[in-house]
């Protein structure tokens, strides 16, 4: 567990943080006065590290605009789903040449209308573990139930002409327990019918990168980001860790 490992490092008086056994130790003061890039071996103490909680190290990164953002919480997604459920599914958009639709009304007081659209391949439904479906009017709990059974789930809402993705603050795609997000700045969402091009492939794999591409979404990648402050008595150096 990285967090307990970092705490142990923090407690040790001196920790060798880099390898390079062939190099002699260089003081941080010398490194701070040098021009990059150079390769050094240091002997230093870990003064602080950020963030303090390991889960806060996970961010979303856009390789196109190089932005870093926080991973939205489940409450944000739930709020967007609730907002989209206000608009009832448009029956005119059901049962097209490339998806079959099922609609029902919930038995609770709200009597929500839910529609699920199962994408077909060669005019046939695929096995659940290979199926992409779209859901309108579902709650967070219902969406997660579907991800346990089906390969891909895309939350959508209906307009007069087509199904469309929700606000990009919500994941545009869920696969297993992974939520995939798009960059709001760099994405230009296309109509959902763009997915029919993948359904027409010989063996649709429903890969997130391909789905993002046909839907005009710039896919955000999960990255691991940390900052360490190292000291050795001659100076303090900030070291950043950034990794996919």
Task: Label the model's feature ranges.
Residues 240-244:
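A beta-strand/beta-hairpin structural motif
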């Amino acid at each position: 567990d990285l967090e307990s490992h970092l705490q142990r490092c923090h407690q040790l008086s001196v920790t060798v943080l880099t390898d390079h056994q062939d190099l002699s130790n260089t003081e941080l003061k010398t490194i701070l006065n040098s021009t990059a890039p150079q390769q050094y071996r240091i002997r230093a103490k870990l003064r602080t590290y950020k963030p303090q909680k390991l889960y806060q190290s996970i961010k979303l990164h856009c390789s196109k605009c190089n932005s870093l953002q926080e991973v939205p919480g489940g409450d944000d997604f739930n709020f967007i789903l609730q907002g989209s459920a206000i608009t009832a599914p448009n029956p005119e958009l059901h049962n097209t040449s490339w998806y079959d639709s099922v609609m029902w009304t919930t038995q609770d007081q709200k009597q929500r209308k839910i529609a699920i659209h199962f994408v077909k391949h060669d005019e046939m439904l695929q096995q659940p573990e290979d199926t992409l479906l779209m859901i309108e009017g579902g709650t967070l709990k219902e969406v997660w139930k579907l991800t346990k059974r089906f390969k891909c789930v895309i939350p959508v809402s209906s307009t007069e002409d087509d199904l469309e993705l929700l606000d990009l603050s919500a994941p545009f795609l869920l696969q297993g327990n992974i939520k995939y997000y798009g960059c709001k700045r760099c994405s230009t969402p296309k109509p959902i019918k763009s997915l029919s091009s993948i359904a027409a492939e010989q063996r649709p794999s429903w890969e997130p990168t391909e789905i993002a591409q046909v839907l005009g979404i710039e896919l955000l990648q999960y990255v691991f980001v940390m900052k360490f402050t190292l000291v050795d008595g001659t100076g303090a150096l900030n070291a950043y860790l950034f990794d996919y």
